[in-house]
Amino acid sequence: MIQGQIVTLIPATLADRQDVYEWCFHSDITKCHAGPPDYPNAPIAPPDEFFGEYGYQDYYFTGEKPTQGMGFLILHQGEAVGFVSYSCFHLQPGMAELDIWMRCEAHCGKGYGSDALLALGEWLRKTLNIRTLMMRPSIRNARANRTYQKVGFVQSDQSPDAFLLAEYVEALGDGDYGAAESALLIKTLSNNTAS
């Protein structure tokens, strides 16, 4: 369990997989990050792709490969309000890529996501010695980009290739939205705090 200021992160389990998928691709906020008409380069992923080779494999829900990645439910007052994860398998040492989405629109704009990102970043710094966090949202998702910047992420003008292991550049270098549509946001964690 990871405690934030207003949310608690608990490891997601295999029993949570379907809910996590539904929150991402079949909720009232899906339109903010995936599928036509606004995101034609990021179609709604079918479950086999979402849980596939470069997606949320079982270890994100079992915790058995924490150096590669792991997922957490975001709880507020005991209620699941979203999902946050980190992935390291494809990145240079000392780095983690974060991803986050809320369960529904009613849980957006309340600080839950910001608090979850700060808490997870601090945990990664202390637990896995992660020093650099990365996020790759769509450049068109203004609300998400503002949230990420509010918690310390900054737009990088480096190529994503500089952060990826060579064997993943071709498959993952363009991000979920394609090279022209994917932002590259970076946050460097200090020795004292992730915030």
Where are the model-predicted features located?
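Terminal substrate-recognition subdomain of acyl/acetyltransferases
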Residues: 1, 166-195
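Conserved GNAT acetyl-CoA-binding A-motif
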Residues: 126-136
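Conserved beta-strand-loop-alpha-helix junction that forms the acyl-donor binding cleft
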Residues: 135-145, 161-166
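Conserved acetyl-CoA-binding loop of GNAT-fold acetyltransferases
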Residues: 149-159
